[in-house]
Amino acid sequence: MNRWAVPILHEHKHYYIVNKVHGIVCQPPDLRTWYKYHDYEPPVLLDLLRKQHPNFGGEVWRTVHRLDEPVTGGVLVSRNKRAAAMFSRSLALGGNRGFPLTRRYVALLAREAKGLPSEGRITMGDMITDYKRLENDLVLLQLQTGRKHQIRKQMAQVFGQPVVNDKMYGGDSVDGIVDNLIGLHSAFIGAQCGLQARTYLIPIPRTQDAFKLWDKYIDEQGGFIPSVQKELRDFSLPSKLENTITLLSGGQGGIQISYK
């Protein structure tokens, strides 16, 4: 199997849903920094797609959202300039403007995060994320904003439990797992173009390390177990979040968790 294979899971006239393996970057990195830590050319998502799927030449591809190098899972790639602009508008302005895009992740934690509501909304400066604890070590997260390392920072600073194998934010190494893979996966994407809305579940990429890391919650094909799939499809916070916990750390006004 090609180490940097980027399978197209779903096709729509305005976009593709692809499954990113760990190690691939969604935008070209600074090469001087890259070669300090790597002895190979940076595997850039769109470059790999063009090489692996040459029959789609002539389309204008854009990644309208990005995943960090060690994060796996679904990425929506627009197929034309208008779609890219409409998805970007939705991400910037929210609501029903542009083409609305829903992004849900699952995160593996080393231990249970105690003392927090089972579900709620995290506001940390300008970073907003909805969450629900599915198991002691498994959290579902839906981005309301998309800042750099948003989920990784919030798991470490709010939950007090970094994502598994995420040493950048204080996570412990996992024996037998490569360094550039963490327990954070883009597992659900919802996209609405005009009146047409579609949702997609994204399996764990078929690599030995990823399957080992997520073994507890996936089947032999990499799909999540039914209980996790149901939560990914159905997740929604209550319309009124009447209670608030304020944490003193985090700066920029601190951290708030709103919950019912």
UniProtKB/Swiss-Prot annotation:
Major place of localization? mitochondrion
Q: Where in the cell is it found?
A: Mitochondrion
Q: Which reaction does it catalyse?
A: uridine(2819) in 21S rRNA = pseudouridine(2819) in 21S rRNA
Where do the catalytic residues lie?
Answer: 68
Q: Which domain of life is it from?
A: Eukaryota
Q: What is its EC number?
A: 5.4.99.43
Q: Which keywords accompany this UniProt record?
A: Isomerase, Mitochondrion, rRNA processing
Give the record's GO biological process terms: enzyme-directed rRNA pseudouridine synthesis
Q: Name one GO molecular function term.
A: pseudouridine synthase activity
- Any transmembrane segments, and where? none
Any Gene Ontology CC annotation:
mitochondrion
Return the PANTHER family for the record: 21S RRNA PSEUDOURIDINE(2819) SYNTHASE (PTHR21600:SF81), MITOCHONDRIAL RNA PSEUDOURIDINE SYNTHASE (PTHR21600)
Please explain the role this protein plays, according to its UniProt record.
Pseudouridylate synthase responsible for the pseudouridine-2819 formation in mitochondrial 21S rRNA. May modulate the efficiency or the fidelity of the mitochondrial translation machinery.
UniProt record similarity statement: Belongs to the pseudouridine synthase RluA family.
Q: What is this protein called?
A: 21S rRNA pseudouridine(2819) synthase
- Per the UniProt record, the source organism is Eremothecium gossypii (strain ATCC 10895 / CBS 109.51 / FGSC 9923 / NRRL Y-1056) (Yeast)
